Amino acid sequence: MRDSDERFKGKALIVDIMGTWCHNCLDESPVLQRLQEQFGKDGLEVVGLSFEISDDPAQARKNLQLYKNRFGLTYTLLFCGSIDDENVKKQIHSQLNNFFAYPTAIFIDKSHQVQTIHSGFKGPGTGDEFQAQIREFEELARKLVQ
């Protein structure tokens, strides 16, 4: 994924560092899908950067397709290699200092300036905290597309 990619020109982005094995990612992905549906027409694009347990591209792509089907995801999921620390450092650490949690959502405005980085995700079991986090994500997405 590059800033120069024509698909993302003039669009606000939520870039999600995730994995199909990550329990909090399982809770976050449907929320991101709803944001894509709600704000996509206004120029929001959600992109998942997936780090998988298996570094076998065929197996990882199969897992990603199953994941997309399970949650009805229409946004882009890109396989970025294994969760091996060296691979993760190579892929993202030079662009994102202090990455430490799956999922990490990066909220980027239409001029491609990072507005917020959100690490972790509070799932439905947290009750009011989950609902507050959904409202926070919705407000962030709304601001990105203005």
Where are these regions (language model features)?
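Short amphipathic alpha-helix with an adjacent loop that forms part of the alpha/beta core around
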Residues: 3-8, 88-96
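Hydrophobic beta-strand anchors of alpha/beta hydrolase catalytic cores
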Residues: 14-15, 46, 105
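Solvent-exposed loop/turn segments at secondary-structure junctions
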Residues: 19-24, 51-56, 82-85, 114, ...
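Structural microenvironment flanking redox-active thiols in thiol-disulfide oxidoreductases
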Residues: 27-72, 84-93
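Thiol-/selenol-based redox modules, centered on thioredoxin-like
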Residues: 101-146
